[in-house]
Regions:
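Single conserved hydrophobic/aromatic residue that forms the stacking wall/gate
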Residues: 174-191
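A short core secondary-structure module
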Residues: 135, 139-176
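Short secondary-structure junction/hinge motifs that connect adjacent elements
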Residues: 16-38
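Buried hydrophobic positions in well-ordered alpha/beta secondary-structure cores of metabolic enzymes
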Residues: 10, 62, 92, 111, ...
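A short, Trp-centered hydrophobic/proline-enriched beta-strand micro-motif
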Residues: 105-113
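Internal helix-loop-helix
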Residues: 7, 37-106, 147-153, 165
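Active-site-adjacent elements of ketosynthase-type condensing enzymes
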Residues: 117-125
Length: 191
């Protein structure tokens, strides 16, 4: 039933619009909203935070069908869950309440790991975060952040203790400012 619903959604909403989204370089926010309303984008969010509490198998079935409609849409619609996984597995109760509940309500999140000089090689990232009072100051550059111009919050991977190697990496949650002037620059994409 879940797989069937995802396939029907992909056939009706995704596949007919994929070429236009690519041609116009548009983020498919309205279609993502519709997928969210059907429950296709929150299957792994635990029930206590408003999701369905299902597993990877169910999510894979959905992603496969959405990807059938358009792999680009599967990536765009999946970026929020990618940013949410670290919270599901290691977030504090406060973080889960604050961010996962927002995901269940339809917000968009972005996963910020890739860097200009490191690509997606996590071990080679150079972004650092330094504690300044109660907040962290993040210094570095991230790129290829799916949905960044539409995200309500960001998962940012940075070193808080470079000398400790991978154990000195931290996941920071950054709530998107509005307006986003100066925060983002758009790079042309081709599909």
């Amino acid at each position: 039933m879940l797989q069937e619903m995802a396939h029907e959604f992909a056939a009706a909403e995704v596949q007919p619009n994929a070429a236009k989204w690519d041609r116009d370089s548009n983020f498919p926010r309205e279609a993502i909203r519709k997928a969210h309303e059907l429950g296709l984008l929150t299957v792994k969010i635990p029930e206590e935070y408003g999701g369905y509490g299902m597993g990877s198998f169910e999510e894979t079935l959905i992603c496969e069908e959405i990807g059938w409609g358009d792999p680009g849409f599967a990536t765009a619609s999946g970026s929020t869950m990618l940013a949410s996984y670290p919270l599901i597995t290691g977030g504090t109760e406060d973080q889960k309440q604050r961010y996962l509940s927002k995901v269940a309500d339809g917000c968009i999140a972005s996963y910020c790991v890739t860097e200009p000089d490191a690509g997606s090689d996590v071990q080679s990232i150079s972004t650092q975060a330094v504690l300044d009072g109660d907040d962290y100051v993040i210094n570095g550059s991230k790129m290829w952040i799916t949905g960044a111009g539409h995200a309500d919050w960001f998962f940012v991977l940075a070193y808080t203790d470079k000398q400790a190697g991978y154990k000195g990496m931290s996941c920071l949650l950054y709530t998107s400012p509005s307006p986003r002037d100066g925060l983002l620059s758009r790079m042309p994409s081709s599909a």
